[in-house]
Amino acid sequence: MLSTLSALYGHLAESGVIPANPAALNRSRLGLGARDASPTIRLTAAQVAALLTAAARPTVRGRYARLHATRSVAYVALLTLGLRVSEITGLDRGDRYRTGGDDVLRVLGKGGLHREVYVTELVREALSDYLAERDRLAGTANPVRRGRSGTGASPLLATRAGARCSRIDLYTQLRRIAADAGPALDGVAERVHPHALRHAYVTIALEHDAPIQHVRADVGHATIATTQHYDRGLRRRSASAADVVAKALDLYKS
């Protein structure tokens, strides 16, 4: 129980929601020796695929069963793009559009900087299924046009009542999915959190020989800000690792 709370508070502290992790152990006060910080869990492509499979399993019955399942799949699918959870919760329906013949998401990253993230077929199908079910049940506000925002914007991921999902909502949802993922996540399910999938995006991409500069551009690391300034107009789908990661995950989909 303590490890679960510590992981939750650790994620909130990392995201800037709270100043520090109140569940972290004070090792010196307890007379324990110093140790290296526990690294982010390293998920394999097979484990990420298991999360996608588990997300599709209905967890509620009745009218909203398909809505919950499709939203869970859409959420995990978005995480396979290497997005931060804060970037996912900030997405509006109008942030999804086509450019140069490709589906993209306009993501607001750290420092208030936007970047375009290429949408894989996995993510496109997951979002289409979820949004179609959401619209069928209750309808939503019309998507805002590209570059526009305001109080009328419709969140890409929403609660059943139509409100924007919070980071805690999605964190809790991912923990539930991980717990249902079966043997593939044995021993690590309690340590799965959104940043672990962002980390997995980077490691899977690099393991499959994606150019590191493409990976850094995909995830919005600050260290490539200068490169992006000069390369923004030339960036194409071929300069993204998204399809590399999607192909790796496809090998393990059931």
Regions found by a protein language model. Name each.
Residues 1-254:
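Conserved catalytic core of the tyrosine transesterase superfamily
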